[in-house]
Amino acid sequence: MSAYAELHCLSNFSFQRGASSAAELFQRAKALGYQALAITDECTLAGIVRAWQASRDTGLKLIVGSEMQVEDGPRLVLLVEDLAGYQGLCRLITRARRRAEKGSYRLLREDFAEPLPGLLALWLTGAGEPLAQGRWLQQVFPQRLWLALELHCGQDDARHLQQQLALARQLGLPAVACGDVHMHVRGRRALQDTMTAIRHHLPVAEAGQRLFANGERHLRPVEVLQGLYPQALLDESLAIAGRCAFDLGQLRYQYPRELVPEGHDAGSWLRVLTQRGIVRRWPTGARAEVLKQIDKELTLICDLGYESYFLTVHDIVDFARRQHILCQGRGSAANSVVCFALGITEIDPDRSTLLFERFLSRERNEPPDIDVDFEHERREEVLQYLFQRYGRHRAALTAVVSTYHGAGAVRDVAKALGLPPDQVNALADCCGHWSDTPPSVERLQEAGFDPQSPVLRRVLSLTGQLIGFPRHLSQHPGGFVISEQPLDHLVPVENATMAERTVIQWDKDDLDMVGLLKVDILALGMLSAIRRCFDLIHGYRGQRYSLASIPPEDPATYEMIGRADTIGVFQIESRAQMSMLPRLKPQNFYDLVIEVAIVRPGPIQGGMVHPYLRRRNRQEPETYPSPELEGVLKRTLGVPLFQEQVMQIAIVAADYTPGEADQLRRSMAAWKRHGGLEPHRERLRRGMNRNGYSDEFATQIFEQIKGFGSYGFPESHAASFALLTYASCWLKCHEPAAFACALINSWPMGFYSPDQILQDARRHGLQVLAVDVGASDWDCSLEPIPVQPARAGNGPPGQPALRLGLRMIKGFREDDARRIERARRQRAFVDIADLGERARLDVRAQELLADAGALQALAGDRYRARWEVAGVERQLGLFAGLPSQEEAPVALPRPSVGEDLQADYHSLGTTLGPHPLALLRPQLAARRCRSSRDLLAVEHGRSVSVAGLVTGRQRPGTASGVTFVTLEDEFGNVNVVVWRDLAERQRRVLVGAQLLKVDGTLETEGEVRHLIAGRLSDLSPLLDGIHVRSRDFR
């Protein structure tokens, strides 16, 4: 039987061209008996690591390559022969991508001026003068050029074959058979046509000759190819494949070495810095156990060759601290005492149980992964520092493969099949944005579609095939790769969408597979808010706080947390967390670690939450299968809540080594996507049986492990987050004005809008002052309270007032605000004309200020301010020389309370006047709607109706289709539970209403109250144009 190697094949990483994944292509090629498969995506190696994995999974040889079009020149397929050829291909792709806009490339003849050893070229003849092109290519690729013949059962195949063979003879070139493969099986042709139409922004019906004439560009049986090509051309494919010996496993990555001073190597310098950190962290001396652990970690770090990596992360964190940028390491790195000593993380080993193997293990072939959060508004300074320190040729961001999800896939397919725009939008609305399935029949019927329509069935079929396909490369939120050698010796580099940034073509999973190290430079809004809060406190009181100096274990802070009074704080501000807080009632830092971790899909789906709560509330006894496991589970009352505990159970009860336990952890994280967990079921059972544990216990542990596959927190990660949770709660409890001010100045971030933060602050008795050009800066600020306002409840003692900043005004520019600040420092504004002249404000800026009520001190009210800005009274003065009686000032009506309210929301997104529902309360009462305050007196199980502004909609993946809605009225919030069937029946009201009435049943459990919805009504017309921001399904 004749053999064959396919040398020209595109995967779906030739975006919107290739219609099959590498895994599908390799499985099919293996089944057809191919000897090798080249993945040659167009000017990219973005999918080559996945192809390498597919090659290893199937045992079929991978040839690395790329298809390229030379500008004003030939089209080529370049195949990698050896390491030098791979590096040359990476450099070519990098040059072509860097000189073009993101998503395109420009490959020039001059790029081939330097020798390209180790690259074999297949010439795909087409436009242009063939003899001239061929002779140029022979000079570029001497003895390494073939003429590629690609036949697809066209009417002209025989003539084309003879012409091409004649050209090859004329130039003295060998010829080879290729397939120009775009899909693994013929059945993907419809998808390939659809993707072509999507790429060209045309309906399929108008794509014409842009579509292939038939479905022959798939992996074909060798017997079929023998009927098309002379045998010599098939044999030549094997000869070329035999020359291509490169394997991605040959790549050798080196970390930068320039951080080591003279007289040291990386290991000795890391020990010096760690020793300095020990003195700083433990001024009175560290415990012997801590020193022993540090020595163990340093030995392993040096043995595995990761010293330079730790030095680099330390350098990044040190830079941030020198620039007063708040930062903190998190994730598995918080298991490392060395990271704590170096200042990378903040988890004191005396406050938590650490498992270093979760971070770094001799037995696993995986580099460490250190995540560091920085203030979200200053992270760019850190990124640019890295570019400047290492150079753009050695530093770049990691890519993220953006894939098709339900809404995007159905939208693109429906457009390509020619559906009108209104139907395209309606179909997309039937999908959840991140859904990985086409819309359900029920959702389609609700939207007025006929699920049996042939066109719709075709749309849904193609959508199902497209979901999960790569759509484009985007930028990782912060993954940064730094190398000793130029990065384009390892992987191609291209431009990011954002200027001054470059991105490698591989994502995080690719880096792990080939052993490249990255550090995550992440942005965290809460760090910005905390640093701003520290600055505000220092400016107002003269007291300087840091994360380390916040008083620990403060009873008042935990009492506030137990009441679920946590709007605006970190991690425990969602409705799910706020429902859990009164049940768990954290009393100390470790309780807070548990709180952060327990409201996650892993513990929920693993059935761990309710047993833990019952044991915590002494409704069920603590039980342990053995004294050894009691040591593992005691701190969580016998219920495994953290990944580290699962690993320790495997070690203690089933005889796993630490490295094997980490492999179990990796399998937990990936089993839903890739499987691989089942082999551990039997391994755990046998190991536990051997140590005296029952099959029932082994099954229970395995099911809990599967739950962790749905996003369970490592304890180290939860502890890192809990530090920020506690800090934000302490600030909210003891410095509420500064905290609210800092949150708004750091927005957009977090869970709540500025309006919700301000409403919460006012409910706590804080005085909020209106935006005013005579007092407001760009940012919100703190002011002394000149006169204690009369109010029903007194605010926290000693708290300043919060003055709204000009940043609150929609559309107002910061430059205008800064000029107002500078002019005001010289002297106060006399009138609007004086403001406009000295702050150099155009009419648009003055109108925005007038509409926001920021000119009331100069004009009296919004209407008068707008009148003066328009210059109406100045224009009346033009007629002053005419004989007439003296004109009295124009009498303008003052805006009503409702008009001011509407203007506030339109301009500021919030109001300091009465809450909208306070004005609507009589109308709501006529509809028998109770307030959130009234619900406090309603008994469990009673039917009740409420109405409120929708401020949040959530549908967690663990909630079996349940939607949680948060309603706000003038007194507080109401948590509403909408079961799946009601949500589907009344989806339009649920998703679209701004003012929602809910008829339902009140359920109470201790201090937790929920309204179980029975009917939903949209009362939004009562708002009369007021728009309220809602956080939906995030």
Curated annotation (Swiss-Prot):
The keyword DNA damage applies. Belongs to the DNA polymerase type-C family. DnaE2 subfamily. Keywords: Cytoplasm, DNA damage, DNA repair, DNA replication, DNA-directed DNA polymerase, Nucleotidyltransferase, Transferase. One of its GO terms (biological process) is DNA replication. It catalyses: DNA(n) + a 2'-deoxyribonucleoside 5'-triphosphate = DNA(n+1) + diphosphate. It is found in: Cytoplasm. InterPro entries: DNA_pol3_alpha_NTPase_dom, DNA_pol3_finger, DnaE2, DnaE2/DnaE/PolC, DNAPol_HHH, NA-bd_OB_tRNA, PHP_dom, Pol/His_phosphatase_N. PANTHER family: DNA POLYMERASE III SUBUNIT ALPHA, ERROR-PRONE DNA POLYMERASE. DNA polymerase involved in damage-induced mutagenesis and translesion synthesis (TLS). It is not the major replicative DNA polymerase. GO terms for cellular component: cytoplasm. HAMAP family: DNApol_error_prone. This is Error-prone DNA polymerase. Its EC number is 2.7.7.7. GO terms for molecular function: 3'-5' exonuclease activity; DNA-directed DNA polymerase activity; nucleic acid binding. The keyword DNA repair applies.
